[in-house]
Amino acid sequence: MASTEYPPMKGGIGRYTYNLVKALRNLGLDVYVACNEAGKGDFSGLSPTNKQNSEVLLKIVEEINPDIVHIQFEPGMYGSILDPINRRNSRTYIDSFYFKCKTPIVTTFHSGYNFGEWMSQSFLIKKAGRLGIFGVPLRFAVKFFSHLLTYNTFKNLNKQKLDQSHSGVVFSNYMLKSIGEGCRIIYHGAEPYSQTISGKKEARSILSLPQDSKLALAIGFRTVSKGWDLLKKMNIPHGWKVVVNSSAGHYSTEKYDMNFITSRSNNIIDLQRDFLEERDFSLLLYACDATLLPYRITSSSGVMFDALSHGIPFIASDLAFFKEFAELGLGITVKRNRTAFSDGIKEIERNYSYYSQNVDKFKEKLKWNFVASEYRSVYSSIKKPRS
């Protein structure tokens, strides 16, 4: 199992990999983890900055001779170069591993954008810089044309990995359309941490959260793509409070000031507890009634799956990924503005039992033993190494 992120490193992909490995081992599979030096895997050496990632993995494969190599893939995790001028120069530091490895490869894809969402990233422009706000038009122009020229390159990096894998896995139909029809959909695993609490009241008591309000949770990494700015504009409905907890990813260099969130409203509770371990993360989800996902862009959301696994419906931006799960009655999508999100909270409250019942049925598909069994089925379907 290869992932540059792995606990105790902070990161959603690392958390996903850890839980999947644990579940696969519970099924009796021998799983060895290759990751970064900061992670507690069985082998190390992988890094977004290591140009020798392929050689590191090839050496590990030669040493342990596995039946399957399972790659948790997101281009930036292994180092990616997107050349807008010469596409042949675009690559990741894991490309040659895919070409040279004779052991069957299974690849789980963690990102895959359609053209509209890929281009929308060019609108996420920082206001600071050498020219300050006056440099925004220039920064936008550079970023816009860079994204325009690199979209097909980004898609090709994923497509190449799929073509060179025995099997590809994605988390949704949206990602299936983006990555390729040769993939299999296995929902992102998520499950409450094993702990004994009597319910929402006790969870709130442990976390010192109010008992007399409904709570909507906004949690994730401090990045502009998460849409945190919307929180300061929202008119939070009567009887509700918004609980916020943000953190910085292990590899993140983005600086995002969250101080503005609590300056406007006493209906926003900023926990400021950084990246939560499994127990506390689960406890926080138990304490809340809904999750807010005002994302500007996304191709997947581990937070959404985690919330669903705790029986919590969502209110999300009207992005294609979220729409897919809203159509299953697991939450709602709205226009990304303060009025729509406020109305979305009210809609969830009015029909809470409907959404809650749908979520309770769906979350069985997210349990890690179920997800691991699906992967075992993928592994078992692979008959022989590549020639």
Regions found by a protein language model. Name each.
Residues 246, 255-282:
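Nucleotide-activated donor-binding/catalytic signature segment of Leloir-type glycosyltransferases, i.e.
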Residues 210-226, 232-236, 243:
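Conserved donor-binding/catalytic core segment of Leloir-type glycosyltransferases
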Residues 328-339, 345-352:
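Conserved acidic donor-binding segment of nucleotide-sugar-dependent glycosyltransferases
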Residues 352-381:
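A charged, aromatic-enriched C-terminal amphipathic alpha-helix characteristic of glycosyltransferases
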Residues 195-209:
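A short helix/loop element that forms part of the nucleotide-sugar donor recognition site in Leloir-type
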Residues 290, 313-316:
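Short hydrophobic beta-strand element within catalytic cores of glycosyltransferases
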Residues 190, 219, 241-257, 274:
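Glycosyltransferase donor-sugar binding loop
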Residues 92-100, 124-167:
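Membrane-proximal helix-turn-helix segments that form the acceptor-binding/catalytic region
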